């Protein structure tokens, strides 16, 4: 049986962490691509030398040539300018559209059948741009956002309630930004809803509201602390979870920025937006779940924000 090939476009902090996790989980051979001369090759050599220690036997190589994307089963895109202190994800729009054009054309010409995961910000717009330039079908391209945002939500809830994070199931929908929608109605601790915990006095409403707010600004909090970069351990872990579900046909239902068809969640057009999504060997399948009226209103705000950025992206492309 042929080994799978995972290509990571962007060999920075997230790309390097993705590569290490892919090796540890024995998902397949790894290619690290970056435009920086020598950097992906150096990281690949370093990672290759972990294999005897980790007890794994896979190939890792670095490259500056898009031809090396050929026959990739999975491509995870992190290439682009990262956030800096005081910078919103949306500030990155113009710069990273150009990056997505170059990367998209590289995918189109070398691995059009690959399963593509986009991590570059602003996420919901970049995955749209990446599809535009790559031509990858709706079911084979997805954005990583909700898995990360939900993990942050779960972490903050577990810390507040002093319980195992494994006991906390919490979900975030909508765009990957300030308008994201943490679903307090669906989320629970060992089967007990957050609403019930509030009623019982085990979780104060003001603390829940603060956790929701902190989740929305979770990425910015890390950027402010690091000062010279943005999060990479958790984003990489989220991307690998999605890739593993595809490669192993696990059919996990994860919150992701999938191409949601008009009619679902009140959409009047097809749109990449974060919703519960099944990821299998066939690709992605958005799922519609019941949400409260308040959450639906919040989701609409998030949808409108994504549409506005898509319009801004279209204007940039038209220049």
Curated annotation (Swiss-Prot):
SUPFAM superfamilies: LDH C-terminal domain-like, NAD(P)-binding Rossmann-fold domains. Transmembrane segments: none annotated. Its EC number is 1.1.1.37. Keywords: NAD, Oxidoreductase, Tricarboxylic acid cycle. It is an enzyme of class 1 (oxidoreductase). This is Malate dehydrogenase. Belongs to the LDH/MDH superfamily. MDH type 3 family. GO terms for molecular function: L-lactate dehydrogenase activity; L-malate dehydrogenase (NAD+) activity. Catalyzes the reversible oxidation of malate to oxaloacetate. The keyword Hydrolase does not apply. The active site is at residue 176. One of its GO terms (biological process) is tricarboxylic acid cycle. It catalyses: (S)-malate + NAD(+) = oxaloacetate + NADH + H(+). Substrate binds at residues 83, 89, 121, 152. It comes from the Bacteria. InterPro entries: L-lactate/malate_DH, Lactate/malate_DH_C, Lactate/malate_DH_N, Lactate_DH/Glyco_Ohase_4_C, Malate_DH_type3, NAD(P)-bd_dom_sf. NAD(+) binds at residues 10-15, 34, 96, 119-121. It comes from Francisella tularensis subsp. tularensis (strain WY96-3418).
